[in-house]
Amino acid sequence: MSEHLIVKNKKAYFNYEIIQTYQAGIVLNGPEIKSIRNHDVSINEAFVLIRKKEIYILNMNVKKYQFANYIKGLEETRTRKLLLHKKEIIKILNKIKQENLTIIPVKLYFKNDYVKLEIALAKGKKLHDKRQTIKKRDTERKELKNYK
């Protein structure tokens, strides 16, 4: 099983405390997959919604593939369906309702020639938690610099 990372959402790790991750497939068109292979995709502003026991990703920006004739009405930031088992969707729904969590996209990657999206159940960090993260990172950098 070979995994090839395409995009990682670095802001997600800074702004949220990640509790649990899930691997989901995405429903895509042919030209979109070509664009993703060229790394012409962004998940920084993307978010995940659950509607009628189905999971969708919104605002995932997949640029138009330059060599493809595009279908009318196909937008770069259209709503795309995520593929998960029903049991996983029900688990996610229950955890969101009980613990007041959100679902965020963490990374996009290829796994055996299929595009997969790693989504995470996360809790938003407060401002003071973010400051502590920055202080911790700075001290680790200083220690590493002094070590060299």
From Swiss-Prot:
GO terms for cellular component: cytosol. It is found in: Cytoplasm. Pfam families: SmpB. Transmembrane segments: none annotated. InterPro entries: SmpB, SsrA-bd_prot, SsrA-bd_prot_CS. The keyword Cytoplasm applies. GO terms for molecular function: RNA binding. Keywords: Cytoplasm, RNA-binding. Its main location: cytoplasm. GO terms for biological process: trans-translation. It comes from the Bacteria. Coiled coil: none annotated. HAMAP family: SmpB. Belongs to the SmpB family. Required for rescue of stalled ribosomes mediated by trans-translation. Binds to transfer-messenger RNA (tmRNA), required for stable association of tmRNA with ribosomes. tmRNA and SmpB together mimic tRNA shape, replacing the anticodon stem-loop with SmpB. tmRNA is encoded by the ssrA gene; the 2 termini fold to resemble tRNA(Ala) and it encodes a 'tag peptide', a short internal open reading frame. During trans-translation Ala-aminoacylated tmRNA acts like a tRNA, entering the A-site of stalled ribosomes, displacing the stalled mRNA. This is SsrA-binding protein. It comes from Mycoplasma mycoides subsp. mycoides SC (strain CCUG 32753 / NCTC 10114 / PG1). The lineage of its organism: Bacteria, Bacillati, Mycoplasmatota, Mollicutes, Mycoplasmataceae.
